Amino acid sequence: MQVNQPFYFASMKDSVEDKGTTDYLRLVAEKVGIESRHIDIEDIGLTSDGRFVDLEDRWIPHLFKLHAWEFIFHEPFGTAIAQCDTQFFEPAWKAILSNKGILPLLWEFNQGHPNLLASHLDTDPGKAVPKGWVRKPFFSREGANIELQTADG
């Protein structure tokens, strides 16, 4: 892959861990001769013609961001993603694969597969988690909002 323009790496301003990850990726990019820049996600701008820019109004041609697509879709600039000319590394369609709602579908079509756990859609999320079950929200990061009931309760 040939990258002739700056490659931006973005993370949330207050996430030290994500900044460390993007700094490492920037270092790798620089080692292979790709000019790279860091930008905080909160500092990415959008021009009137739908172009993503940095704080100096420079176009962001390539972007790797450590921020979930499902959050971006609901942010003010989320609607600009489909029409913009920024190349995202981790394309927006990956949000489908990161959605835990795909797990029951995989189980339905591949029941008993050794790499899958039995998964079902929760028809009553307000109800307590039964013994021996785990409840995961459709969108979850780093184990957040997971409910677990051991077999013993």
Regions inferred by a protein language model and the residue ranges of each:
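Domain-scale recognition of functional cores that engage charged ligands
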Residues: 1-153
